């Protein structure tokens, strides 16, 4: 061997102290500058490289304090930030203490490079003390890594060694990383699959179980690249085949391959998908879902489950993004175009096309489910694309032509997902389409005024509400009805309509509590605004910024009560156009009536009070609900109606209270109480709660009345004068209700004195009676309530309120509130149906 040339490569020098261990004590051998150097010797037939750590004396640079070769199985330990300690091949313990941590970093990096390129058997380990000082943590920075054999011919021995190595390498992150790179680089999974097929053919169960455990161990490495490689086309069948064998169930085997090959989970194209990249992503997403939910469901821990879920979410996002630009969605939704559907009725439509439409509903539902995890803006973008491409045609087909209840439920779930995200999204997209069509018409016809007129007269599209209402009234499937009611609640919730319209209000320096511009009780809007903001009037710029949204929401609910509510609540509307047979069919449908009663409670509580109250009272809906409490109906329906009545009286609304008193709507409640007088059941508890509400509110009013009379002299004078002139005492809606039930149903209440709340009501009634002028009682019966609620004007008929009377309630409400707060010494003139008349009658 002939020497050719020698090259030396060195690192920067760093100041350091050198220590040697002698007699169990560290001896300082001097201070100098340390550097690492690699000596490359070129020989004729090969190249030899050697690495050294050299320390030269800081005062005498030519004097070498240390020259240590990096060789053999030396383990270098980095302790804390500035120490490197090791034992050389001769057994000497050496330590280098660097002046700065940067110097230690430089030499550690040198050791890492030497291990990777020159001396693979050396290692570098970081040693860190734990917080309590009672131990240390070791982390491998670099070092030799034992790896499984990649010989083509595997056997039981090599598989056992591989399993042991893979398990050992999970101890340190460095070992895991090196193992993953090795496995992917050398296609080790393909090697396992090949031997698996051989072992299965030759019936070698030990090898089959070993391969299964090896693959599961690699899954536990929790590395994304390995997980994704398992579901590639060339590997997926082999992987699920390996995972059919489980050492926990040695006598049985799963059938994952059969499931993938023969049943529905296989990739199915309703219409041809030409985008091969998208097709690959869809397949990979499904296979990962299959692994997570079926194959590995009993094996995955939380970390593995989280990783696979994250991968699936990323793939689903990719799918949704691709579908928005791919023609696949257009081709799919063309199956539901109205021309094709209605024309197909004239001929025998092929079974294949019907099946495609069924599968299309499932596919769109899957896409909607995928989109639930998208960001808000991405989700809105996708939903808008669906609506523009014809989603409503699909929904129309599902609800009007499809007979499979499961598919109808999926279509309803699709609606719910969209309206829960943005209740106005569908309407806004349809409005954009309408405006676009108007602009096109303008370009073609050149008639600008006509286009403007068309846009100005555009009305709110309530097609979705109409579809849902029809389903609720006509479909008997309980699961579908539940979803429809959920969708209706979302569509009809005022807060859902607000959306992001007020996001910019904070930019104006204002903090609106609960969006006071859209409160249900908005009669004193300026006062509420002044109380919360300190401003005397609502600033014009605030109204301008939200005016369009407010008008849109107001029109939305206005049209609901005109177009949809009469049909939706038809079974509860008195004197509607239904035949007796049709009405009886609805009334006998307990599930439907329960849903409708809950919806009535919802709109009374959540909607603008004026418009919802007008609709409810004008159509005698409360009378119908009260009638449902009578005997002859299912107990659950009777209790639902009772709950609705309780919710409405809790609104503390004058008009609701007077209507229910004057029409004796509490009579069925008392009958129900008599039925369950001494029973310990749900009905009795619900009825006790009814009395609790009245008793507690009467008590609260009493306290407030005392505070009003004695807290301020001015108020005391005005209140006394008002009471003297009106000949009445201060009252509340609940006080009136208490008087009504005590005057009307004393026998029933006397039987209920064992109930604390009923006893309180009787005591409050007696106390209230003593306070009446001259000690005279005045009963609140249906007859004398008629004196002030307008029934005598309505030809003396009780029951349903006339339209004119309800209009009176609404017209006078603002003036009434002003009058009630007035301190004018002149008594106000009482108007028909006004609160002033109501108080005076008592």
UniProtKB/Swiss-Prot annotation:
Main location: nucleus
Subcellular location: Nucleus
InterPro entries for this protein: ARM-type_fold, EVH1_PP4R3, P4R3-like_central_dom, PH-like_dom_sf, PP4R3-like
Pfam annotation, one family: PP4R3
GO CC terms of this entry: nucleoplasm; protein phosphatase 4 complex
GO molecular function (one): protein phosphatase activator activity
Keyword Nucleus: yes
GO biological process assignments: DNA damage response; meiotic recombination checkpoint signaling; negative regulation of DNA damage checkpoint; negative regulation of glucose mediated signaling pathway; positive regulation of double-strand break repair via nonhomologous end joining
Coiled coil: none
Keywords attached to this entry: Nucleus
Complexes and interactors: Regulatory subunit 3 (R3) of the histone H2A phosphatase complex (HTP-C) consisting of PPH3, PSY2 and PSY4.
Summary of the function given for this chain in its UniProt record: Core regulatory subunit of the histone H2A phosphatase complex, which dephosphorylates H2AS128ph (gamma-H2A) that has been displaced from sites of DNA lesions in the double-stranded DNA break repair process. Dephosphorylation is necessary for efficient recovery from the DNA damage checkpoint.
Protein name per UniProt: Serine/threonine-protein phosphatase 4 regulatory subunit 3
Naturally occurring in which organism (per UniProt): Candida glabrata (strain ATCC 2001 / BCRC 20586 / JCM 3761 / NBRC 0622 / NRRL Y-65 / CBS 138)
